[in-house]
């Protein structure tokens, strides 16, 4: 379950970065 949460956080961070770049 921890792994899933970690991956979800990474995706969120990636999304935020992509939004910031755009």
Swiss-Prot record:
One GO MF term attached to the UniProt entry: toxin activity
Tissue distribution: Expressed by the venom gland.
Q: Which UniProt keywords apply?
A: Disulfide bond, Secreted, Toxin
Description of post-translational modifications: Contains 8 disulfide bonds.
Compartments where found? Secreted
State whether keyword Disulfide bond applies. Answer: yes
Where is the segment annotated Disordered? 1-22
Q: Name one GO cellular component term.
A: extracellular region
Q: Where is the composition biased (Basic and acidic residues)?
A: 1-15
Q: Which family does it belong to?
A: Belongs to the CRISP family.
The name this protein carries in UniProt is Cysteine-rich venom protein notescatin
